[in-house]
């Protein structure tokens, strides 16, 4: 039986996400990112194509490394202005039934107690269709604007993330017992306080004495996504991730990354297939190879090279304006997206990219490769990435929105279905059940969150803290 390919749309609540300048194309609706109807239409379109998920990226800083300023990013709308990624999800869920929503939130800038509530709320309102893309943030501008002197070091951010996840799992999985919520109108008991427990967490970075203030949602813990395959990021993913987003420039490099991740997952006590791995890809297609190539050339005529260099400046922490455009890029240690620079300095056949290469090959597609072709050519390549590269699926970025998604659904999905690679209907249940296959929609028993199930049963509860009251048995007055 052929392996089904997981299909996620990769988007962001901004104008220019991965392709700089193409918002100017006549068919682009990218400038409607503030319009709720844009997002609800997108969700319905994805469900028409039986996509697994809308993966929503986010940043809370700006791209101000290139030429020492955010001016170019603002001029080209390169991930700025950008809205909160949570805002449109409930509306999208209201017009769909199955497609999932992977929302990005950085652990560096929000307390776990608050973020746990936001994610549980969405999991309730979507009936269990939420994933959380865990990131540690990489833009120094974001750190400065929340009052930090500078961005935390790369590995320290992952140390924080380890403890952050521990707090989240305690809140989601442990603080409420399964039968804590009674909803008993006759007795007047909505929640049995003896079955709700403070987590009493006190660690190096976080202190959370209380209990989760949301009742358990359909999945309790949302599906955990993680982006980044640096050494420390891979270790974090091997323990926590159920879906992992990787950047790669070749099938060979993808095979190395996916094999390493699965080896680490196995070493962490999880199965090798417990993590679904998605790679970034932009597909430009039509009814033939020639039509797709013509479309690609048209899109390139709208691309903005300096806009892409502004994005790459933020992604790598390097001001490309200061580099010789024809000199190979050099690997370096900094606190930006390490895998971005690694993908450019350790590429296929040891190729090292130049600034001119980035301009020529990445103005469309951004952080990932671009695949141009008709249905058969594209399907062949997708199968090769899956069968030889070891990925489970793709985060599909757009060149022009919503046209790139519609073209993929109209041209590529039917071809993949002919080959037994794409679903033509959805399984019932939560996103986790659809994507991972767990029967009850809860995290697998080998996942670190599972250790907190029933962990507080028999321990201190909210009821234990209740003081005597003379009004405990009082009745409401009856109007005469």
Curated annotation (Swiss-Prot):
<dbReference type="InterPro" id="IPR036661">
    <property type="entry name" value="Luciferase-like_sf"/>
</dbReference>
<feature type="binding site">
    <location>
        <position position="104"/>
    </location>
    <ligand>
        <name>FMN</name>
    </ligand>
</feature>
<keyword id="KW-0285">Flavoprotein</keyword>
<dbReference type="InterPro" id="IPR016215">
    <property type="entry name" value="NTA_MOA"/>
</dbReference>
<feature type="region of interest" description="Disordered">
    <location>
        <begin position="423"/>
        <end position="480"/>
    </location>
</feature>
<keyword id="KW-0560">Oxidoreductase</keyword>
<feature type="binding site">
    <location>
        <position position="158"/>
    </location>
    <ligand>
        <name>FMN</name>
    </ligand>
</feature>
<feature type="binding site">
    <location>
        <position position="230"/>
    </location>
    <ligand>
        <name>FMN</name>
    </ligand>
</feature>
<comment type="similarity">
    <text>Belongs to the NtaA/SnaA/DszA monooxygenase family.</text>
</comment>
<feature type="binding site">
    <location>
        <position position="154"/>
    </location>
    <ligand>
        <name>FMN</name>
    </ligand>
</feature>
<keyword id="KW-0503">Monooxygenase</keyword>
<comment type="subunit">
    <text>Heterodimer of 2 subunits, DmoA and DmoB.</text>
</comment>
<feature type="binding site">
    <location>
        <position position="58"/>
    </location>
    <ligand>
        <name>FMN</name>
    </ligand>
</feature>
<dbReference type="GO" id="GO:0018633">
    <property type="term" value="F:dimethyl sulfide monooxygenase activity"/>
</dbReference>
<comment type="function">
    <text>Monooxygenase that mediates oxidation of dimethyl sulfide, the first step in dimethyl sulfide degradation pathway. Has much lower activity with diethyl sulfide and other short-chain alkyl methyl sulfides.</text>
</comment>
<dbReference type="InterPro" id="IPR051260">
    <property type="entry name" value="Diverse_substr_monoxygenases"/>
</dbReference>
<protein>
    <recommendedName>
        <fullName>Dimethyl-sulfide monooxygenase</fullName>
        <ecNumber>1.14.13.131</ecNumber>
    </recommendedName>
</protein>
<dbReference type="Pfam" id="PF00296">
    <property type="entry name" value="Bac_luciferase"/>
</dbReference>
<keyword id="KW-0520">NAD</keyword>
<dbReference type="InterPro" id="IPR011251">
    <property type="entry name" value="Luciferase-like_dom"/>
</dbReference>
<keyword id="KW-0288">FMN</keyword>
């Amino acid at each position: 039986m052929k392996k089904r390919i997981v299909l996620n749309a990769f988007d962001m609540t901004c104008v220019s996400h991965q392709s700089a300048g193409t918002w100017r194309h006549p068919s682009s609706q990218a400038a409607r990112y503030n319009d709720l109807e844009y997002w609800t239409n997108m969700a319905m379109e994805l469900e028409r194509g039986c996509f697994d998920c809308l993966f929503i990226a986010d940043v809370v800083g700006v791209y101000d490394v290139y030429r020492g300023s955010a001016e170019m990013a603002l001029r080209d709308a390169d991930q700025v202005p950008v809205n909160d990624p949570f805002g449109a999800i409930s509306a999208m869920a209201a017009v769909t039934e199955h497609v999932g929503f992977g929302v990005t939130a950085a652990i560096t800038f929000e307390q776990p107690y608050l973020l746990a509530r936001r994610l549980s709320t969405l999991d309730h309102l979507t009936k269990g269709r939420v994933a959380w893309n865990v990131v540690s943030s990489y833009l120094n501008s974001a750190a400065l604007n929340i009052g930090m002197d500078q961005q935390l070091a790369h590995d320290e951010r992952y140390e924080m993330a380890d403890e952050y996840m521990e707090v989240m799992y305690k809140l989601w999985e442990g603080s409420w017992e399964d039968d804590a919520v009674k909803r008993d109108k006759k007795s007047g008991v909505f929640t049995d306080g003896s079955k709700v427990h403070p987590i009493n967490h006190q660690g190096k970075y976080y202190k959370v004495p209380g209990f989760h203030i949301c009742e358990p949602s359909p999945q309790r813990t949302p599906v955990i996504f993680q982006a980044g395959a640096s050494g420390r990021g891979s270790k974090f993913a091997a323990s926590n991730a159920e879906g992992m987003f990787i950047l790669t420039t070749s099938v060979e490099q993808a095979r190395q990354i996916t094999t390493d991740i699965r080896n680490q997952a196995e070493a962490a006590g999880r199965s090798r297939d417990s993590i679904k791995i998605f790679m970034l890809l932009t597909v430009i297609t039509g009814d033939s190879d020639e039509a797709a190539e013509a479309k690609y050339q048209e899109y390139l005529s709208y691309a903005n090279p300096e806009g892409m260099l502004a994005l790459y400046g933020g992604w790598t922490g390097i001001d490309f304006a200061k580099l010789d455009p024809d000199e190979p890029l050099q690997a370096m240690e900094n606190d930006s997206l390490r895998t971005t620079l690694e993908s450019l300095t350790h590429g296929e056949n040891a190729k090292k990219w130049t600034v001119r290469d980035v301009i020529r090959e990445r103005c469309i597609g951004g952080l990932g490769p671009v695949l141009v072709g008709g249905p058969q050519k594209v399907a062949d390549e997708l199968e090769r990435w899956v069968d030889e590269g070891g990925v489970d699926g793709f985060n599909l970025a757009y060149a022009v929105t919503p046209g790139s998604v519609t073209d993929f659904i109209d041209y590529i999905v039917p071809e993949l279905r002919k080959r037994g690679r794409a679903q033509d209907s959805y399984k019932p249940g939560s996103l986790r059940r659809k994507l991972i296959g767990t029967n009850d929609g809860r995290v697998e028993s080998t996942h670190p969150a599972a250790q907190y199930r029933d962990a507080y049963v028999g321990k201190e509860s909210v009821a234990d803290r209740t003081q005597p009251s003379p009004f405990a048995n009082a009745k409401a007055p009856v109007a005469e």
